[in-house]
From Swiss-Prot:
This is Serine/threonine transporter SstT. InterPro entries: Na-dicarboxylate_symporter, Na:dicarbo_symporter_sf, Ser_Thr_transp_SstT. It is a multi-pass membrane protein. The chain crosses the membrane at residues 9-29, 36-56, 75-95, 134-154, 175-195, 209-229, 281-301, 323-343, 349-369. It catalyses: L-serine(in) + Na(+)(in) = L-serine(out) + Na(+)(out); L-threonine(in) + Na(+)(in) = L-threonine(out) + Na(+)(out). The keyword Cell inner membrane applies.
Amino acid sequence: MRWVQRTSLVTQIAIAVVIGIVLAAVWPAATPHLAILGSLFISALKAVAPVLVFVLVMSAISNHTPGETTHIRPVLVLYAVGTLAAATVGVVASMWFPSTLTLQAPAQAAAGPGSVSEVLMNVLKSVVENPVKALLEANYIGILAWAIALGLALRHASAGTRAMLQDGAAAVTQVIQLVIRLAPLGILGLVASTFAEAGAQALWGYAQLLAVLLGCMLFVALVVNPLIVYVAIRRNPYPLVLMCLRESGVTAFFTRSSAANIPINLALAKRLRLNEDTYSIAIPLGATINMAGAAITISVLSLAAANTLGIQVDLPTALLLCVVASLCACGASGVAGGSLLLIPLACSLFGIGNDVAMQVVAIGFIIGILQDSAETALNSSTDVIFTAAACLAQERKAQV
């Protein structure tokens, strides 16, 4: 027990990853039992995250001091710039290193959105969702909308009511901290079950495609994002970027859920001493609309399909794909199947039929063991990186 208290959470997670891989290799029969740990951990995170976001945002807004600014707009600008930059990286990399896919007979099509307007309409409908249904289904746009509305209304409540909201937020935060302490056990189960079920064999056939996807995500995480952060804070961005990748990206990689990683990001933002009025809104919102990894996935797989079919993509169409991929990525959390089911929408730019596009989606699910994990790690870590950058930029301006 003392060792657990002395050792950092990141170190414990790293040890859990190694143990999980070893167990999957030498004792695969035990992995179904270990998988229970992973599923329980993800379920616990997903269960507490909607309540945490609702209570925390409502408490932060109702107790907001008049005259203080929340700096949400700079965070949203960083989210938009980061997502568009990621889509551009995906397009450029696909043109420099074109990938091909093995496409067979038409696959059974799943129901994906038909147009960009449909994706945006789904997002708008989420805003006016029934609040109870929004909490039950973890619709974070709806949760944020109701939390903001109730928080604004409760600004005029008595001091005792607002203090009760603060106490409620503190209580939920304590529950979250308990769940986060169990992360090493959960990740041990996730790693063991993932490696035992899929292994590395299923990925070799798509080695180049995976290399392009993961290379783009690494480039965005280690080059593009630090550059954006540097422009915002005007000092070395790497201490902040690497800390967020280590503290947020590692857990997101294994949970494969931006929503489940919201509590981890909120705890990290608190440790960084960011403005609570800013991060309590910006991080849950980022889990919904800040999707750099999804933009890369959509652009790379769409261009791989076009290249396989011999379709020549000109510069204007490539630029349009960057914009479409960015818009689609922002709506990815509102579509079952996330970024993969938005690929047919992007493929429609090249005149690729839905039957072929859904085969590309199927390939995406095959490589999802790495693609989805890396995508989520980039998405979720970028939420807290850009939120911190916006807060630090405002502090720098205030000191000038």
